[in-house]
């Protein structure tokens, strides 16, 4: 049977989401799988909606795993996966929180059934840096920026494009994505002046794409790059060394959208077919 997990984590002290083979590197996947396996007394392999990089956070991550029904017949679970929330809260470190465990609807796949992923990048240009209570999820930028110039640079990126200039190379992986939203917001307050957020939404993202999009717009906003910088990058045919990558600490995955339950399987099949048809896709 398939189980859906809804979880959050502070990515600061993790080497990203993905387990690194047999390595003891601390990753979100390794910590979760090890603890789930201990509770369920069976090996667990997680599939996730968004494979976040080292230092990137999540407040809305979704994963799934398959497990024999008998593994849920523990005395403390009694076949009710929701009881895993309390069990895991006693075992997991403070920088991971699993807040939802449920039977997955038929056809659900955390990765391929997803319609879109939502990210927020949080950054301050104040010379004092971020609030001490937000220092782990807010990046500091050393120069003032023009938010309207950044929005103009972001607008040209909306739509279906090959974002190869913004993506780190990955063998046999497509870099074609549909960027559905990229908006900049001044969210300054009296206690957090010169604070900005980028809201970025796409059907999926390739490795390092969001941080490269943000860094490119910030370069335009501070005047280091011309206003047509991002438009020029869209014409590239390979990863550009000119693309600045924003620090990981400012980025958070904040949500994953799925279709209605009766459309989950069709969406997963459609996504697999499209990825397979794209140039360079596996």
UniProtKB/Swiss-Prot annotation:
What's the superkingdom here? Bacteria
Alphabetized InterPro entries for the sequence:
PsdUridine_synth_cat_dom_sf, PsdUridine_synth_TruA, PsdUridine_synth_TruA_a/b_dom, PsdUridine_synth_TruA_C, TruA/RsuA/RluB/E/F_N
Transmembrane stretches in the record are none
Q: Which GO terms describe its biological process?
A: tRNA pseudouridine synthesis
Reactions catalysed, as given in the entry: uridine(38/39/40) in tRNA = pseudouridine(38/39/40) in tRNA
| Residues noted as binding substrate in the record, renumbered to the chain | 119
Q: Does the keyword Cell inner membrane apply?
A: no
Gene3D superfamilies referenced in this protein's UniProt entry, alphabetically: Pseudouridine synthase I, catalytic domain, C-terminal subdomain, Pseudouridine synthase I, catalytic domain, N-terminal subdomain
Catalytic residues as annotated in Swiss-Prot or TrEMBL: 53 (nucleophile)
- Cite the Pfam families for this sequence: PseudoU_synth_1
Provide the alphabetized UniProt keywords: Isomerase, tRNA processing
EC identifiers of the protein: 5.4.99.12
One GO MF term: RNA binding
> What is the stated purpose of this protein?
Formation of pseudouridine at positions 38, 39 and 40 in the anticodon stem and loop of transfer RNAs.
Query: What family does the database annotate?
Result: Belongs to the tRNA pseudouridine synthase TruA family.
What the entry lists under PANTHER family is as follows: PSEUDOURIDYLATE SYNTHASE, TRNA PSEUDOURIDINE SYNTHASE-LIKE 1
What quaternary arrangement does the UniProt entry report? Homodimer.
UniProt-recorded name of the protein: tRNA pseudouridine synthase A
List the lineage, top down. Answer: Bacteria, Bacillati, Actinomycetota, Actinomycetes, Mycobacteriales
